[in-house]
């Protein structure tokens, strides 16, 4: 017969063991849901990650990210020949530093192009391009091969890595096609417009199918227009009227407002087009009235065929 003292010891050990097991189970469950919440990966994947890493959340997170990246690249390789005719333009402007970018990200379907995860990716790509592209010129156009090598945000991976990861998550082929970057001097003014962008932007970015950036100077203060509003109107005109070039200022401007000026509806030079915001007035006359000089502009359309692609 066991003594009462011996039975008491066994009982105490069993209670302690049960209590410790319960605590471990609660901790394990807590870690599982914590990992699920912070990473967004499936519950079964999170459970596998914790089992492989002895319950260490940090190591499990690292393992999950590595697995997701590998699966993303594998998926990207499988779908790389699928056409990506849908997508979005995303505009990110940093007014404090007088710079902005428009990035085009393509996907297979309009359904994914409107997905919040896709738009979130687009906005982070635009921020990465503007912050991490080491450009010195006022205007630079980058293609896919240059873009995928850039650092993604402040993380230890590239834009190419992040796009591949998103391909794995969303299940469609994607491609960061091009980006235009404006980094202007202090005396220059930056204007921008994105057609179709909602008032509630995501991550301070604007999305749409048509976008424009314009670089201009004002020789004196304007009582009618604030620089930002003027830049927006000029960029909006560029999106709507599709100019192909700036054109040259004429040597002489009309001396009176009574002079009749013929405006060609098919004009492709920006300066000689009818200004969208002021009918029967050429852009150059509007600029002259408001002491404005346009230095440069760019207009992008999502999915448009560009010259370099036509020659392929």
Regions found by a protein language model. Give the residues of each.
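N-terminal assembly/interaction segments in proteins that build large macromolecular machines
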Residues: 2, 19-312
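N-terminal chloroplast transit peptides
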Residues: 1-15
